[in-house]
Amino acid sequence: MESTKGSEWRRWELHIHTPDTQKNDNFTGSSSEEKWEKYYQDISTYIGSGDDPLKAVAVIAITDYLSIDNYKKVIADNKLPTSVKLVLPNVEMRIQPIANDSPINIHFVFNPDIISSIESRFFLKINFRYNSTTFSASHSELIRLGNTIDSSLEGLA
């Protein structure tokens, strides 16, 4: 493989939240569907065809707190501009202690090839305690935590 082009720089946006994000969903729209359509339209308008090097984005990481559900939705919807060559899942977490009155955020960007095992290899391994009960960060355990905190939530998830 011989190339005379040299290095090629590409823009990556590794912290992109979506509608229905777990925290601070500030997207506008009268319904979830409307928020998502506007989201995809805004990205397409900004990136365009990918020809403008100042706007072209080759890689996007879909970010959410303790979840990859919206990443899966973006992949299933397949509505990003074709100039976006790779979409990565990015799990965001806040840890203690806070720094300068602000929480410390940690981002875990995963290879899309391991999506099917993130629940068992990542979320199930994150453990914490609430009222002397241990929970993991898996989807089912977070529901159990919610029901423990407020039993009126039972059966809503």
Locations of regions flagged by a protein language model:
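Extended substrate/RNA-proximal surfaces in nucleic-acid metabolism proteins
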Residues: E2, K72-A157
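An N-terminally biased module of ancient metal coordination in phosphate/nucleic-acid-related enzymes
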Residues: M1-P103
